[in-house]
Amino acid sequence: MLGSLGLWALLPTAVEAPPNRRTCVFFEAPGVRGSTKTLGELLDTGTELPRAIRCLYSRCCFGIWNLTQDRAQVEMQGCRDSDEPGCESLHCDPSPRAHPSPGSTLFTCSCGTDFCNANYSHLPPPGSPGTPGSQGPQAAPGESIWMALVLLGLFLLLLLLLGSIILALLQRKNYRVRGEPVPEPRPDSGRDWSVELQELPELCFSQVIREGGHAVVWAGQLQGKLVAIKAFPPRSVAQFQAERALYELPGLQHDHIVRFITASRGGPGRLLSGPLLVLELHPKGSLCHYLTQYTSDWGSSLRMALSLAQGLAFLHEERWQNGQYKPGIAHRDLSSQNVLIREDGSCAIGDLGLALVLPGLTQPPAWTPTQPQGPAAIMEAGTQRYMAPELLDKTLDLQDWGMALRRADIYSLALLLWEILSRCPDLRPDSSPPPFQLAYEAELGNTPTSDELWALAVQERRRPYIPSTWRCFATDPDGLRELLEDCWDADPEARLTAECVQQRLAALAHPQESHPFPESCPRGCPPLCPEDCTSIPAPTILPCRPQRSACHFSVQQGPCSRNPQPACTLSPV
């Protein structure tokens, strides 16, 4: 049985953690990717290893050991990016985790006392994953006093919290006895939406077309035109203001980004009143719904793929136009539910609820975008199925997080391109593609867990299956396969940019043209194809009564069978 590593003896005795900051042992073995150095402040303790680090974003330490042939080696030690389950432990109790190398097992621990990640007393046998580790080191007499003080402090804190709750209930009761309205909690915001936003009497609600965690999307009409209304409850005003701020950025107008019309307040009833985003409505619904219901020939599939890449390239681009600065933006929640189909069959990217403004190189001096608070906010992402491997295993490059988030979007884009091409009959010898499946649905089913996705996409490095018949149709036999593989590469730095993706797709759309390849794009990227000028037929204008009354059209639910909140199709009655 392994004994203690004895790392405590290597720590300088002069390091003392301030009472409000956690101090941990810091060490990273040579060759380890994804440094956690930015999660804390390295203390100047000389050149000896390991060093000490003072945590910036949590009060939790971690340690990772590699057990090979009954011999343990330290892989990483440092601060966690947030307080996670297990951080309440006073000692380092390692638990096993699979290792990609045969004959090796990783052991990890989280703990919440100073330098607690420096040592462990016992590692569980590698052949019994899930076996809890043995108890940590016995507490010294001084530690017993410290633990008693901690328990006393927690008791006093609980008592104070209980008193605050009782006081709030008494105040609420007094308001009711005196007949005064109970004051509602006001969200912490620089702008009071209830005062700033005006109601639109001509806005009417028809039918719910999608429900999310922070908002409900309605089909409706504004001044005789069909619109989508994203209604937020008052408790989600922070999400409303974040998404509104992005839509109101100068220069964000693009054919393949859902068009923002206005912000308002109201609802289908007085009791449901809250902040609203009024957006362009696309009656054909989401990409998921469309692919479930229809197949698309080679030209239509390339049209959807190219327009999707153009929209993402525009979001990612930092540019000046007509004296206005548009920053680069990472979407962070690309999925076939958040991409809509326009009347001309092209795509429009929607749902900027998790989108993030990226640091730029040419931004004006007065430009002060809201920066994310800590690594946890940077690595926040949307639909798990479309999350890049570096987000699943939390190894995103925090040194250059702007570029890292762009690369994570490219991975999601590759999965959407695969979904589009999987419904193209021209890529099948019998012209009969199989029923639509989401990315990884064939491998993991409808509701994969994060652990299942991590094992498949990170540990095994598997990707959705590309049929060999795709090579038989395209003018460039390996073009489709190379495009997808260059977008969902396990190495984020090896992935294409969104601009290069649209140039590759343009070459597939117009193979007869001569395309010079710029040197800046890996494996060559042809220039952009000309903009498509296909006109969009105007939607039918239907009569509408004032706000909170039903509109004279109905929404036919067109289920995307893989999602409980499907996209919908509008149809006049």
From Swiss-Prot:
Q: Give residues annotated as binding ATP.
A: I209, R210, E211, G212, G213, H214, A215, V216, V217, K230
Reactions it catalyzes: L-threonyl-[receptor-protein] + ATP = O-phospho-L-threonyl-[receptor-protein] + ADP + H(+); L-seryl-[receptor-protein] + ATP = O-phospho-L-seryl-[receptor-protein] + ADP + H(+)
What are the boundaries of the signal sequence?
Answer: 1-17
Enzyme Commission number(s): 2.7.11.30
The Swiss-Prot or TrEMBL record lists the needed cofactor(s) as: Mg(2+); Mn(2+)
Cite the SUPFAM superfamilies for this sequence.
Protein kinase-like (PK-like), Snake toxin-like
Q: Which InterPro entries match?
A: Anti-muellerian_hrmn_rcpt_II (IPR015771), Kinase-like_dom_sf (IPR011009), Prot_kinase_dom (IPR000719), Snake_toxin-like_sf (IPR045860), TGFB_receptor (IPR000333)
Keyword terms of this UniProt record:
ATP-binding, Disease variant, Disulfide bond, Glycoprotein, Kinase, Magnesium, Manganese, Membrane, Metal-binding, Nucleotide-binding, Pseudohermaphroditism, Receptor, Serine/threonine-protein kinase, Signal, Transferase, Transmembrane, Transmembrane helix
**Membrane-topology annotation of the record:** Single-pass type I membrane protein
Molecular function terms from GO: anti-Mullerian hormone receptor activity; ATP binding; hormone binding; metal ion binding; protein homodimerization activity; transforming growth factor beta receptor activity; transforming growth factor beta receptor activity, type II
Top-tier EC class:
transferase
Which residue ranges are assigned to the Cytoplasmic compartment in the record's topology? 171-573
Instruction: Mention one GO biological process in which this protein takes part, according to its record.
Output: male gonad development
Q: Where in the cell is it found?
A: Membrane
Q: Which residues form the active site?
A: D333
Q: Gene3D superfamilies from the xrefs?
A: CD59 (2.10.60.10), Phosphorylase Kinase, domain 1 (3.30.200.20), Transferase(Phosphotransferase) domain 1 (1.10.510.10)
Example GO CC term: the record gives: plasma membrane
Described by its record, this protein's role is as follows: On ligand binding, forms a receptor complex consisting of two type II and two type I transmembrane serine/threonine kinases. Type II receptors phosphorylate and activate type I receptors which autophosphorylate, then bind and activate SMAD transcriptional regulators. Receptor for anti-Muellerian hormone.
Related illness = Persistent Muellerian duct syndrome 2: A form of male pseudohermaphroditism characterized by a failure of Muellerian duct regression in otherwise normal males.
Q: What is annotated about its quaternary structure and interactions?
A: Interacts with type I receptor ACVR1.
Name of the protein in its database record = Anti-Muellerian hormone type-2 receptor
Q: Which organism is it from?
A: Homo sapiens (Human)
Which lineage is the organism of this entry classified under, starting from the top rank? Eukaryota, Metazoa, Chordata, Craniata, Vertebrata
User: What is the gene name?
Assistant: AMHR2
